[in-house]
């Protein structure tokens, strides 16, 4: 529970810092990331609203893990489902009905994440949870949150590297290929996410199973769980990539009707 409380405090502090830094420097950063004169206004409108809701986003991303590790996989899944469904409902209302455009898309995302954050905090402070979020455990202690940061470094480096590569690609494409090239890259990235997100779900879902059996000193079950995950990921990735290679235009058409981009 001390780890839970310390991680919550770190997330709150990080969200405050990120909100201030990125809100103030949003236009400059977007330029650095490759936004052109045409896309800068839209990107800035979306970013400023999304940044203001970074607290809710970080709570959902960071605290939902504590629900999964306790064995409440369904509750954890409902967090994602609730956010996704609300976002799907609000997007067309804000974008088209209210005519808010990009700002509406950002607001819909923030509101859906806020509902997910409330859902998580209500569960972690409720009676069903095994580990309860308490104010007394929110005082930062290096010996408590230090190991958490150490364990997260590898994931941080991996995701940061992916982000830097994405920024580099976008900036280069914007400079040498224009908005059409950036749009094409965005479509490719979206298609790749269709592949990677289920893989992340499989791997994250297997983490508690492997952890429980490792702690119970059952190496055979750990190996079986890993082998099952590995084979599932290989089969899914191979099948999906084969379909995309055979029908590339069909997948591109999901995200745009522009023939030039397709």
Please provide the spans of the model-predicted regions:
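Small-residue-rich hydrophobic transmembrane alpha-helices
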Residues: 1-20, 57-76, 184-248
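Residue-level signature of transmembrane alpha-helical cores of multipass secondary-active transporters
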Residues: 11, 50, 76, 80, ...
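Short runs within selected transmembrane alpha-helices of multi-pass transporters and secretion channels
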Residues: 50-68, 76-84, 105-118, 200-204
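Membrane-interface helix-loop junctions in multi-pass transport and translocation proteins
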Residues: 84-118, 248-250, 254
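Structural signal for membrane-spanning alpha-helices in multi-pass inner-membrane proteins
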Residues: 22, 65, 91, 95, ...
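Alpha-helical transmembrane segments of multi-pass membrane proteins
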Residues: 37-60, 187-193, 259-262
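Interhelical loop/hinge segments that connect adjacent transmembrane helices in multipass membrane
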Residues: 109, 120-156, 162
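Helix-terminus/linker motif at the lipid-water interface of multi-pass membrane proteins
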Residues: 30-37, 93-100, 156, 160-190, ...
């Amino acid at each position: 529970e001390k780890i839970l409380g310390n991680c919550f405090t770190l997330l709150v502090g990080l969200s405050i810092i990120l909100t201030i830094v990125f809100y103030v420097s949003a236009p400059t950063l977007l330029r650095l990331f490759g936004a052109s004169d045409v896309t800068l206004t839209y990107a800035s409108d979306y970013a400023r609203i999304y940044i203001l809701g970074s607290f809710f986003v970080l709570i959902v991303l960071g605290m939902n893990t504590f629900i999964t590790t306790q064995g409440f996989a369904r509750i954890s899944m409902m967090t994602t489902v609730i956010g996704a469904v609300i976002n799907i409902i609000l997007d067309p209302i804000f974008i088209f009905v209210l005519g808010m455009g990009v700002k509406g898309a950002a607001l819909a995302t923030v509101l859906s994440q806020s509902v997910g954050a409330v859902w998580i905090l209500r569960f972690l402070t409720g009676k069903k949870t095994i580990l309860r979020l308490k104010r007394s455990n929110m005082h930062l202690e290096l010996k408590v949150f230090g190991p958490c940061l150490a364990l997260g470094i590898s994931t941080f480096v991996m995701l940061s590297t992916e982000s830097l590569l994405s920024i580099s690609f976008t900036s280069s494409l914007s400079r040498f290929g224009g908005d059409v090239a950036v749009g094409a890259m965005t479509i490719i990235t979206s298609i790749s996410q269709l592949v990677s997100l289920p893989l992340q779900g499989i791997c994250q879902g297997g983490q508690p199973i492997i952890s429980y059996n490792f702690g119970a000193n059952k190496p055979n079950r750990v190996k079986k769980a890993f082998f099952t995950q590995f084979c599932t990921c290989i089969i899914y990735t191979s099948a999906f990539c084969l379909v995309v290679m055979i029908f590339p235009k069909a997948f591109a058409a999901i995200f745009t009707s522009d023939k030039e981009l397709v």
